[in-house]
Curated annotation (Swiss-Prot):
N-acetylmethionine modifications at: M1
Keyword Lipid metabolism: no
One function term, GO molecular function aspect: preribosome binding
Species per Swiss-Prot/TrEMBL record: Mus musculus (Mouse)
Keyword Zinc assigned: no
Gene expressing this chain: Cinp
Phosphoserine, modified sites: S69, S73
Name under which the protein is recorded: Cyclin-dependent kinase 2-interacting protein
């Protein structure tokens, strides 16, 4: 009878402690996924730059070869084009592999956001109509963890779509200035706002991964 009474007296503690631990793990996962994204994105920029440089190099050679139409130069042009096609294909495959890696990272980000939403729904069910909900850590309400996760997930989803577009267009672009624009967009990641990293750092502070 006594054990049953104890079980009824403290129903919330295990739920909240599990939720807090899960949110803390999620914050660490966000940190690690963004580090992996940045590393892979930098690698992708290097590969994309190589594709753009190869295109520019070929265009320069074609301009020179137009001035000469001898049989020897035509034969050399065919060999050059064959080497170019092989090199471009290898670089495009490398860039596609990087995009596949970024896609997997973004899918994991969406899963983190979904998990955080589930924690919010569990809390809503647990507290029902109660307006006073103590924070699991310092000051953040649980719903704010989901809001930050949702914003981050959406930002990286948009950035991923942009990178896929750049990857598809870059190898077919003959305009040097357009290639440079694509490379600039890849590097600066316009959909990932500067406050995204600030939100991540705030989440790490809130969950105790960073010292206050």
């Amino acid at each position: 009878m006594e054990a049953k009474t104890l079980g009824i007296a403290t129903p919330r503690k295990p739920v909240l402690s599990v939720s807090a631990r899960k949110l803390k793990d999620n914050a660490a996962d966000w940190h690690n996924l963004i580090l992996k994204w940045d590393s892979l994105s930098d690698k992708g920029f290097t590969t994309a730059s190589s594709i753009a440089n190869l295109k520019v190099s070929l265009l320069s050679k074609e301009k020179v070869e137009l001035e000469s139409s001898s049989p020897a130069s035509m034969e050399e042009e065919e060999k050059t084009n064959l080497d170019y096609d092989k090199g471009l294909e290898a670089l495009c495959e490398e860039l596609q592999a990087i995009l596949d890696g970024l896609t997997k990272i973004q899918m994991k980000m969406e899963k983190l956001s979904s998990t955080t939403k589930g924690i919010c729904e569990l809390e809503n069910y647990h507290y029902r109509e109660e307006s006073s909900r103590p924070p699991l850590f310092h000051t953040w309400p649980t719903a704010f963890f989901y809001e930050v996760s949702r914003r981050l997930s959406e930002a990286y989803k948009k950035e991923l779509l942009l990178k896929h577009t750049i990857g598809a267009e870059l190898a077919h672009t003959a305009d040097r200035n357009l290639s440079l624009t694509y490379l600039s967009m890849w590097l600066h990641q316009p959909y990932i706002e500067s406050n995204s990293k600030l939100q991540l750092e705030s989440m790490l502070l809130e969950t105790g991964h960073r010292a206050l």
